[in-house]
């Protein structure tokens, strides 16, 4: 708590609200609205859109974000099946790679293949760890279920996966080491 108190105080002084994050409504709207395709639509962000930046400056951050959240919630209520379909797409993009997000478009399929392969191996490792009742496996399950959930509602980006990649790496190493044991190729370290 001592680490975040200065940030809470800063936000209260600057924004009038003691919050850790204040931009959820704007992010929700970027991912949900007319033309939404499950990806980050940067052209709707105030830093990329002159009209949105003007609104942001006129209203202030808290009012702007609240307005964008109302727009997103209205869209979700109006077409909930579409929102669910977008959430499913974002789930696929989070674990399989976001399309068209490479600076070199020809590399995007390769990049996404590696992204997807690492996810499949991590899920496989998690499944094996749970079946074998490995200590801590349930913690990894809850991490993998809970951490990315918000990105299924807004939009995925490869950097949003970085915080859990060490755990995914552990699961990948686990499944590979289990495969080595099964083949009889285990060596003494």
Question: What are the residue ranges of the model-derived segments?
Answer:
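Internal alpha-helical transmembrane segments
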Residues: 1-17
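Transmembrane alpha-helices and membrane-interface helical segments
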Residues: 121-129, 144-145, 165-182
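Membrane-interface anchor segments at the N-terminal boundary of transmembrane helices
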Residues: 68, 74-140
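Hydrophobic/aromatic-rich transmembrane helices and adjacent perimembrane loops
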Residues: 113-116, 150, 156-177
